[in-house]
Amino acid sequence: MSTPLSPTLPPLPDGESEPTLVLVEAKPSFAWLVMLHGPRRGRLYHLRAEGTSLGRGATNDIIVDDEAVSRFHSRLFAEPVFDKLQFYVQDLASANGTFVNGLRVVRQVLHDEDRIVVGQATLVFKQL
């Protein structure tokens, strides 16, 4: 009785021996913050993937008029992760810190419904 042979494939042409990298474009993502507690309660802020600044200073994208908030308190931004954009919050060495779900953070991945606290203000993160 003979052993069946496995079929053999012809060798790949030169330069095609490495696997092809498949590029995946990040899907559009919509994210925003809603001010739950603070001077602008109920206000909605759309987040830009390239970055959204938050602080007491007048040049911030999101202005929080609270003396416990630093002039340039934190920054929200997105980075591509596989096929979607992942949003982060980063504290900018603020005096009183940035908190996500009760924990002080330096840089933190954000998930839908996370609560961000800066000074006396509480904002909820939303993402589609």
Over which residues does each language-model region extend?
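Forkhead-associated
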Residues: H46-Q127
